[in-house]
């Protein structure tokens, strides 16, 4: 999981979700697209 100050969807399968006040990008098709904002 990579940490960025601004997160973006890297493919059409990526989803942006909020958990515990943090924003995450989750991608089941390509797990290397996982990101966290902070």
From Swiss-Prot:
Keyword Ribonucleoprotein part of the UniProt annotation = yes
This entry's Gene Ontology molecular function terms read:
structural constituent of ribosome
GO-annotated biological processes: translation
Keyword Lipoprotein annotated: no
Look up the domain of life of the source.
Answer: Bacteria
Q: Name one GO cellular component term.
A: ribosome
Keywords from UniProt, A to Z, are: Ribonucleoprotein, Ribosomal protein
Q: Which HAMAP family match?
A: Ribosomal_bL36
Q: Sorted alphabetically, which PANTHER family does this protein's record hold?
A: RIBOSOMAL PROTEIN
The similarity annotation says: Belongs to the bacterial ribosomal protein bL36 family.
> What protein name applies here?
Large ribosomal subunit protein bL36
Name the source organism: Chlorobaculum parvum (strain DSM 263 / NCIMB 8327)
| Gene name of the encoded protein | rpmJ
């Amino acid at each position: 999981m990579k940490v960025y100050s601004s997160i973006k969807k890297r493919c059409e399968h990526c989803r942006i979700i909020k958990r515990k006040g943090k924003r995450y990008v989750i991608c089941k098709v390509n797990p290397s697209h996982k990101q966290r904002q902070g």
